[in-house]
Amino acid sequence: GDADLSLRFDLTVPLAKYVALHYADLAFPFRRYQIGKVYRGERAQRGRFREFYQADIDIIGDGKLDITNEAEIPSIIYQTFSTLGLKRFQIRVNNRKILNGFYAMLGLTDKAGDIMRTVDKLDKIGAEKVRTLLIDEVGVSAESADEILKFIAITGSNDQVLSALEGYAGRNETFDEGLDQLKTVVKYLSAFGVPEENFAVDLTIARGLDYYTGTVYETALLDHPEICLLYTSDAADD
């Protein structure tokens, strides 16, 4: 007929429909996992496919989820990879509230999404080209671009990065909330048995979609950087 049809883009929309239909029958927080084929209408190239398997792990709350749930997912990533015999992998953790709060300190709240999407290209194009894009395309000043690159370049042990972030605390409520959440996630990841060699606070991690509101993660094989990200995860309040 004339019906508009499409192949399944992801496993998230079907999950949202399922929760909406069975809301009264579910016990919250509702945990589930699913593996299935999904499809993307993009140009096929190395590391990008039009058809592939996606594995989803989700925790759905009836209201606001406790921050400890945001540490549960990366601990499952660690258990999964370890069970598969993979050892040299790293779960990179950040919090969107930290980024939004920092950009608000610079007076760039309205450009935060564009900044994050530009910074997301750092591994591919390098810091100098990211700086150029921030100035020429996003429209931030050269001074702000330098502040952004300085901020996302903070590295070290997890304790060292968190300590450096303390230097920015007290100037923005959203930033402070994100920092508290990130500290809690790091604490619980250790409590759940994830070695620090397998997870790191990484301020370049943002994820591309604006509905991500809290903890964000990406996972990569350290010995095979040419392989695209194997596992990504994000927290969303809505």
Question: Where are these predicted regions, by residue range?
Answer:
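Positively charged, Gly/Ser-enriched RNA/tRNA-binding surfaces
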Residues: D2, D10-K87, K97, L133-L229, ...
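A short acidic (Asp/Glu
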Residues: G101-A104
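A short, hydrophobic C-terminal helix/tail in secreted or cell-surface proteins
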Residues: D234-D238
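Glycine-centered helix-coil hinge/cap
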Residues: G126-K129, E173
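Acidic, His- and aromatic-enriched active-site or binding-groove loops in soluble protein domains
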Residues: L108-A127
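Short internal beta-strands
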Residues: I91-V93
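Charged, often glycine-rich, active-site loop that binds/positions anionic groups
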Residues: G1, L106
